[in-house]
């Protein structure tokens, strides 16, 4: 419900794309410059950057920003037009993106599916630079055949474009002797414009090639380039870096490691360590800046390098030189993270081989058959022979076979290839034939085979066996296995395959040369010793592994899910426009191993296993063949005019989330941007996705509005209040508000965040500042490259506003921007969100604007009162009451500071502080508590202040306790207990967590503070382990129910059907309860991380695991059946207490007698926090002896952090996103502290400090009776209204109004006007606010007031206020 207004709804500094000045929200949303650059809005849309440049040139205001973009756009469009002429069709989205990067002179790694035209683009771009720019290019290919093919393609392009003068030189091994001699002569003379060779030639002649200056080097065999340090140096030299530049790059790598170490030391507890780290960090930063500037200057004179994606994971310092010198890291295959496979299994009635033959004959050509690795090449050969005898054209393929077999298979001359299911084998990893491979058959479950002697001590092999022993019920074995796993996993992350193989060979020979060797040897010896124990073998039989006897020896068969996913993935490949459908069939030869495979695969991917016999095979094969036909048409270029692949930028908030999403789709390529940002690039089929992080908020309200801001806002504002302009609308009293935003700066030294336009930290003076403007520039850079932009910030009002700010910043560079909403970070959720983007929700944005502006206004209005009026009063009280000797937390501060600026007040903060104060004061008051105890069990308790208990009862108890103190004789009572009712009842499970209940239990059960719990939950969400954690919904989605069912089936087997009770809990809305996203419990999660199956972008600590376990158990409990509980109701009568009678209810049993399987225990099987109590008496009634205990106790106990959050939810103030922040602020301001419980167990109590009590009393009581003589009559009258500003009722009402804005039932300007009316008099009279049109009103009301003069003189010394206060607008 936007108000009609003459001015902008918002102003953003630095976002004019032309001059870099402030720009309005409305102009940004249209992609236009600020009013100074473009005074008159164009009637029609502006066509691109070149059209905008022409428009600004006519105005005489063309600036550097638009001029540079127009030049880049024209360069890219020239390449697009040339490409269309050369190829016969316009470039697709990916090719347009690559052209834009080339126009900028960037180097990058290509991640793209089959059929997108990588090589075609490389050839066309090379010809463009040769023909139109007179610049050389070099194309490097993996094979002679491809080199010859590209040469033919270039010759055709030359003819199409009329570039007959371009000199093309092709050198490969199939040239005749005379042709090669002539080619080499031309090469030596430099008689070429485009050079095409293999990678081997590039390595051999790198020094000679470095003498030619290339504009483009296109490498279609990056694996060959990354194979060795020599290969890396060769390509860097060819691109244009000499030995000196390479050495500088290596020095940068060393300094970056040192910088990371020093940043870690800034967190030290010792000041001298931090100070030394600061000095060294500045020195390292300066050296890095110098070296990076020198490299940047050199980079401007080098070729653009384009490389294809890598199949492996390259490691080593030389590989990292690409990042330093060329700003990118080569990614892996962009399609291994995606699969579209029908996963099935079948049990053979005869033999495995016979079943394989039957399947292949039914499924036809285009098949891959995999035999288990323990069966070996010999079995693959025998199986291929059996297939041939059955009339199938089959061949076994392995390392000793010629590569031409793969070519014959690709051409259709061979129907089926048979190979070994080896993770590193060609048929498992290196085959990418989307038009040819239709299905895969596994002749036995993929597995590893281990004997008791272990065999080869390769670390990866040992890790697999350790992962099985880690599941052993023998705790000492499982614990030791997990310990060895952690060490080996760290080793596998940092060492190359060659280094790992060398370690294995040394250990096998009994040679130990270093720490890594020793770790492998220790793991090897542990495994041998463990497998020599009979009890270990017995425990293994309980797991989903195979135990077989062969030749008098026992072996373990361990399922190999990674190989299964890789091998079956050969049937489902990315191509330009989608992912091919594939079929996988496992012929089961060992049932336990198959169960283990199915279970382990589900931890790595979303797989729906089906019986092969239940498949609609005809329909599946028809779809498989239709997909292959699409691929063939794409490769032949028959989809001209149809854009099958587009590029998209996805912006999320955190780098962790960006990395997590990228890894769903394989090993991403990474580009480093000038502002320090990273962009991860992956392929999803119809999109090439570039993923970046905004780092959270990129803009916040300015502290002081200036003239340029007013110019951008337009209209005639009446006031500027703490970064917000107020406009009067007509004569009806309505108003409109324009927030003014600027970039956020963060000190890398002390962590302080500020918005001042300063190059030094206002708090500590450090020059180590990170400005969010650099993030904006990086985002704009990538947004210009993309066809479309998606903003995937968090799914709440704060995330909507962050996303809206980002969208406005990017709009001039990206016309197509949409919002993505996802509540869990999983591959499925991301793909669904990409398929269903939405527009931004203006109501959510407006609601967050209201929250931020209201928070700023209240804080900036009230906080100065605390700094400059409250503090001296408080200090006077402290010094008078405590003197010089009695300790007090603020005595030294009072002596040191006349004003104290680490104080604040807020609308939600103050009532919350009030609850803590009330409980703290009540805690100091004492009442008598009488406990009547039988056999250490509390029967009942009586408090002396309980109005429900008769006074006569209290008097008797009091007398007995006093008598005991005098005589030392313990008072005893006779209590008659009668069972009134005894019945079995259903005990319902708790609902899944919302934010408040999670914080309560994290505090109560784990001892975590609310801020820490939220930080841990944020990690778990961003790592893709739980759903969004800022929610007040208990709703469970269908997917959530499926997660519960799958885990219960794994955990309880056949009992799962009796235990599973799916519940929705809440209805409607997009939000969901907090739950795990996969059926993985905490023990399994820990193992999968240690195995490397799950890779997280951060360190999984014990606290992460404990909170995850709590969330996991609570959710599983919510989806389980009720517990059968035996409830007993007792009536207790105490004759000696005037016949006092009361009722006592207890749950004495959970789970019915005779239920050995525990089904009737229901949800308590996983939720251990519900326990039965002992029976009070046996039989129906009995007299029992009870002891009376009496002691003084607090009238009320203080809150715990969890209870404070629960109270905020119950009383309706605060929101899921602010609960923890409010509590954290109270601690940071030292208004509250945490104290241990008397019994020393459980979450600590939160008590108000002297400072907190006095702050609360000042705001709510003292100002209510402000003295007119001290403050002046007018000001005193206004100060008396302050208590109402921070009252709980007013806060709750404002929360209600903000909820109405969120739903679209109220206008943001109307709500802000109501807040302004509350604070305006105070702001004007104290000269805080900048009156624009009516300055005399403020001056007139405060002239001659001594209190105001002193107050302002004090307040302007605050770093926050000195740039806000003062007359007029700066």
UniProtKB/Swiss-Prot annotation:
Catalytic reaction annotation: ATP + H2O = ADP + phosphate + H(+)
EC id: 5.6.2.-
Positions of the Topo IA-type catalytic domain: 841-1323
Protein's UniProt keywords contain RNA-binding: no
Residues covered by the Helicase ATP-binding domain: 99-287
Keyword annotations of the record: ATP-binding, Cytoplasm, DNA-binding, Isomerase, Magnesium, Metal-binding, Nucleotide-binding, Repeat, Topoisomerase, Zinc, Zinc-finger
Domain annotation Toprim: ranges: 647-825
Zinc finger (RG N-terminal-type): 6-47
Cited InterPro entries: AAA+_ATPase (IPR003593), DEAD/DEAH_box_helicase_dom (IPR011545), Helicase_ATP-bd (IPR014001), Helicase_C-like (IPR001650), P-loop_NTPase (IPR027417), Reverse_gyrase (IPR005736), Topo_IA_2 (IPR003601), Topo_IA_cen (IPR013497)
Cofactor binding, per record: Binds 2 zinc ions per subunit.
Segments forming RG C-terminal-type zinc fingers: 744-772
Binding-site positions, Zn(2+) 2: 747, 750, 761, 764
GO biological process, one term: DNA topological change
Superkingdom per UniProt: Archaea
Entry cofactors: Zn(2+); Mg(2+)
Region (Topoisomerase I): 643-1370
KW Ligase (keyword) present: no
UniProt: ATP binding residues: 95, 112-119
Gene Ontology cellular component list: cytoplasm
Motif (DEAD box): 220-223
Similarity field: In the N-terminal section; belongs to the DEAD box helicase family. DDVD subfamily. In the C-terminal section; belongs to the type IA topoisomerase family.
Assembly mode: Monomer.
Domain notes: Introduction of positive supercoils requires the cooperation of both domains. The helicase-like domain probably does not directly unwind DNA, but more likely acts by driving ATP-dependent conformational changes within the whole enzyme. A beta hairpin in the 'latch' region of the N-terminal domain plays a regulatory role in the enzyme, repressing topoisomerase activity in the absence of ATP and preventing the enzyme from acting as an ATP-independent relaxing enzyme; it also helps to coordinate nucleotide hydrolysis by the ATPase domain with the supercoiling activity of the topoisomerase domain.
Task of the protein: Modifies the topological state of DNA by introducing positive supercoils in an ATP-dependent process, increasing the linking number in steps of +1. Binds to single-stranded DNA, transiently cleaves and then rejoins the ends, introducing a positive supercoil in the process. The scissile phosphodiester is attacked by the catalytic tyrosine of the enzyme, resulting in the formation of a DNA-(5'-phosphotyrosyl)-enzyme intermediate. Probably involved in rewinding DNA strands in regions of the chromosome that have opened up to allow replication, transcription, DNA repair and/or for DNA protection.
Protein name stated in the entry: Reverse gyrase 1
Organism: Aeropyrum pernix (strain ATCC 700893 / DSM 11879 / JCM 9820 / NBRC 100138 / K1)
């Amino acid at each position: 419900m936007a108000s009609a207004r003459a001015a902008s709804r918002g102003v953003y500094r630095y976002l004019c794309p032309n001059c870099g000045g402030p720009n309005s929200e409305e102009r940004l949303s249209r992609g236009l410059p600020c009013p100074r650059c473009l005074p008159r809005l164009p009637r029609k849309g502006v066509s691109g950057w070149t059209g905008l440049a022409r428009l600004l040139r006519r105005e005489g205001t063309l600036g550097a920003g638009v001029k540079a973009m127009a030049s880049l756009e024209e360069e890219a469009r020239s390449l697009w037009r040339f490409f269309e002429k050369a190829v016969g069709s316009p470039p697709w989205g990916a090719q347009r993106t690559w052209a834009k990067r080339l126009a900028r002179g960037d180097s990058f790694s290509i991640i793209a599916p089959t059929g997108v035209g990588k090589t075609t683009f490389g050839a066309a771009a090379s010809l463009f630079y040769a023909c139109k720019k007179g610049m050389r290019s070099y194309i490097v290919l993996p094979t002679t055949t491809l080199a010859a093919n590209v040469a033919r393609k270039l010759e055709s392009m030359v003819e199409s474009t009329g570039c007959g003068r371009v000199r093309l030189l092709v050198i490969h091994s199939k040239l005749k002797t005379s042709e090669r001699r002539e080619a080499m002569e031309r090469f030596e003379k430099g008689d070429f414009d485009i050079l095409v060779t293999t990678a081997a030639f590039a390595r051999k002649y790198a020094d000679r090639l470095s003498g030619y200056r290339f504009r483009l080097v296109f490498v279609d065999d990056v694996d060959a380039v990354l194979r060795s340090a020599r290969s890396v140096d060769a390509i860097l030299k060819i691109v244009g870096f000499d030995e000196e530049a390479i050495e500088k790059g290596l020095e940068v790598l060393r300094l970056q490691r040192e910088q990371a170490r020093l940043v870690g030391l800034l967190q030290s507890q010792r000041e001298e360590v931090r100070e030394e780290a600061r000095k060294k960090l500045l020195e390292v930063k300066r050296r890095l800046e110098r070296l990076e500037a020198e490299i940047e200057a050199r980079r401007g004179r080098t070729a653009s390098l384009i490389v294809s994606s890598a199949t492996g994971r390259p490691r080593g310092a030389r590989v990292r030189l690409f990042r330093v010198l060329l700003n990118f890291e080569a990614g892996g295959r962009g399609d291994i993270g995606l699969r579209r496979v029908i996963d099935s299994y079948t049990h053979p009635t005869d033999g495995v081989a016979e079943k394989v033959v039957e399947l292949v004959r039914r499924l036809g050509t285009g098949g891959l058959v995999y035999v288990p690795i323990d069966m070996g090449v010999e079995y693959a050969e025998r199986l291929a022979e059996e297939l041939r005898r059955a009339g199938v054209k089959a061949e076994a393929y392995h390392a000793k076979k010629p590569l031409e077999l793969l070519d014959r298979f690709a051409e259709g001359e061979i129907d089926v290839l048979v190979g070994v299911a080896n993770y590193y084998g060609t048929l498992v990893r290196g085959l990418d034939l989307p038009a040819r491979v239709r299905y895969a058959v596994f002749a036995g479950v993929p597995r590893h085979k281990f004997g008791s002697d272990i065999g080869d001590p390769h670390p990866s092999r040992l890790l697999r066996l350790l992962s099985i022993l880690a599941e052993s019920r023998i705790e000492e074995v499982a614990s030791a296995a997990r310990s060895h796993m952690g060490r080996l996993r760290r080793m596998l992350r940092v060492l190359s395959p060659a280094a790992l193989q060398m370690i294995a060979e040394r250990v096998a020979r009994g040679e130990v040369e270093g720490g890594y060797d020793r770790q492998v040897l220790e793991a090897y010896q542990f495994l041998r010793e463990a497998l020599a124990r009979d009890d270990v073998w017995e425990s293994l039989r309980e797991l989903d592994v195979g135990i077989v006897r062969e030749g008098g020896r026992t072996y373990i068969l361990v399922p190999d899910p990674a190989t299964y996913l890789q091998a079956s993935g050969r049937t489902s490949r990315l191509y330009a426009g989608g992912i091919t459908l594939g079929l996988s069939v496992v012929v089961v030869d060992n049932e336990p191993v198959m169960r283990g495979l199915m279970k382990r695969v589900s931890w790595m991917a979303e797989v729906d296993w089906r019986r092969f016999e239940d498949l609609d095979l005809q329909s599946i094969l028809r779809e498989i063949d239709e997909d292959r036909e699409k691929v063939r048409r794409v490769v032949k270029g028959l989809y001209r005019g149809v854009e099958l692949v587009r590029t998209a930028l996805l912006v999320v908030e955190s780098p962790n989330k960006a990395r997590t999403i990228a890894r769903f789709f394989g090993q991403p390529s990474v580009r480093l941007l000038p502002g320090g940002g990273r962009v991860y690039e992956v392929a999803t089929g119809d999109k090439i996705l570039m993923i970046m992080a905004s780092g959270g908020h990129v803009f916040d309200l300015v502290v002081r509005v200036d003239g340029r801001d007013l110019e951008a806002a337009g209209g005639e504002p009446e006031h500027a209040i703490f970064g917000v302009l107020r406009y009067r609308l007509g004569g009806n009293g309505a108003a409109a508000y324009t927030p003014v935003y600027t970039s956020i700066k963060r000190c890398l030294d002390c962590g302080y965040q500020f918005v001042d336009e300063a190059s030094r930290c206002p708090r500590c003076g450090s020059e180590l500042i990170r400005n969010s403007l650099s993030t904006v520039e990086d985002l704009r850079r990538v947004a210009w490259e993309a066809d479309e932009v998606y903003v995937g910030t968090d799914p709440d009002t704060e995330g909507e506003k962050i996303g809206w700010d980002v969208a406005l910043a990017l709009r001039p560079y990206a016309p197509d921007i949409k919002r993505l909403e996802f509540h869990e970070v999983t591959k499925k959720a991301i793909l669904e969100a990409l398929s269903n983007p939405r527009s931004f929700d203006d109501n959510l944005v407006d609601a967050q604007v209201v929250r931020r502006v209201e928070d700023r206004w209240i804080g900036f209005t009230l906080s100065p009162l605390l700094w400059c009026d409250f503090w001296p009063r408080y200090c006077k009280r402290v010094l008078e009451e405590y003197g010089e000797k009695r300790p007090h937390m603020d005595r030294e501060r009072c002596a040191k500071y006349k004003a104290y600026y680490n104080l604040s007040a807020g609308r939600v903060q103050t009532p919350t502080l009030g609850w803590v104060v009330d409980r703290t004061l009540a805690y100091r008051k004492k009442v008598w508590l009488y406990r009547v105890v039988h056999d250490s069990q509390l029967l009942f308790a009586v408090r002396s202040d309980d109005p429900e208990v008769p006074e006569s009862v209290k008097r008797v108890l009091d007398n007995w306790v006093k008598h005991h103190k005098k005589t030392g004789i313990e008072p005893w009572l006779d209590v008659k207990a009668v069972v009134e009712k005894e019945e079995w009842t259903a005990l319902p499970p708790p609902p899944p967590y919302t934010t408040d209940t999670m914080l309560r239990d994290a505090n109560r059960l784990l001892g975590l503070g609310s801020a820490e719990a939220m930080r841990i939950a944020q990690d778990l969400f961003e790592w893709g382990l739980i759903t969004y954690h800022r929610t007040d919904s208990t709703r469970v989605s269908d997917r959530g129910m499926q997660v519960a069912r799958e885990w219960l089936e794994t955990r309880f087997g056949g009992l799962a059907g009796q235990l599973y009770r799916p519940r929705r809990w809440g209805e409607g809305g997009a939000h969901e309860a907090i739950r795990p996203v996969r059926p993985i419990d905490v023990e399994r999660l820990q193992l999968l991380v240690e195995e490397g199956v799950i890779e997280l972008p951060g360190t999984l600590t014990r606290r992460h695991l404990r909170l995850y376990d709590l969330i996991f158990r609570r959710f599983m409990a919510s989806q389980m059946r009720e517990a059968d509980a035996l409830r007993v109701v007792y009536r207790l009568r105490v004759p000696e207490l005037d016949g006092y009678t009361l009722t006592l209810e207890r749950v004495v049993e959970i789970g019915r007698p005779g239920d050995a399987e525990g089904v009737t225990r229901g949800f308590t099987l996983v939720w251990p926090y519900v326990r039965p109590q002992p029976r009070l008496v046996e039989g129906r009634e009995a007299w029992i002896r009870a002891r009376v205990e009496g002691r003084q106790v607090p009238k009320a106990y203080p809150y715990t952090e969890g209870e404070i959050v629960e109270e905020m939810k119950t009383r309706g103030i605060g929101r899921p996103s602010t609960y923890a922040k409010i509590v954290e602020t109270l601690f940071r301001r030292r208004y509250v502290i945490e104290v241990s419980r008397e019994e020393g167990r459980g979450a600590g109590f939160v008590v108000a400090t002297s400072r907190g009590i006095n702050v609360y009393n000042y705001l709510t009581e003292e100002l209510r009776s402000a003295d007119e003589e001290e403050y002046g009559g007018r000001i005193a009258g206004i100060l008396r209204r302050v208590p109402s500003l921070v009252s709980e009722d007013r806060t709750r009402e404002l929360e209600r109004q903000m909820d109405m804005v969120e739903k679209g039932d109220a206008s943001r300007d109307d709500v802000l006007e109501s807040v302004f009316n509350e604070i305006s008099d105070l702001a004007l009279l104290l000269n805080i606010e900048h009156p624009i049109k009516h300055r005399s009103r403020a001056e007139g009301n405060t002239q001659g007031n001594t209190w105001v003069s002193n107050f302002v003189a004090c307040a302007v010394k605050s770093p926050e206020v000195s740039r806000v206060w003062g007359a007029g607008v700066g």
